Amino acid sequence: MSDCPFCLIAEESNENELIAVNRSAVAFFDKYPVSQGHALVIPKRHEANFFNLLPEEQLDLWKLLNEVHLALSDTFLPEGFNVGINIAETGGQTVDHAHVHLIPRYGGDVEDPRGGVRWVIPDKAPYWGTK
């Protein structure tokens, strides 16, 4: 899809932009990172919904995610990670090409990191304070 920014990255295979590549996925640094080393892993084939990818494409994404995790760990020395997939507009997806966020986390990057990805719905996140 020529107007999809992620397809352009995957098609051009610009080695300067890519962190890693396998048979059906590529990884690159997020253009608008929320932390140092924030990366995206995407399928080469255009598909908006992660769950509509072929099983082998999903597997390749996860394999590449593991490879990128090791590279980011060696390069940036984060203390933790968040992994996230936004699906559809309601789920927060802003680019209609499936992608997995790999977000390195560092001590002190937020006041209280408990709950991690649960904060996508702030009112429900602090479950540890309920009885």
Residue ranges and their predicted role:
Residues 1-131:
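HIT superfamily nucleotide-processing domains
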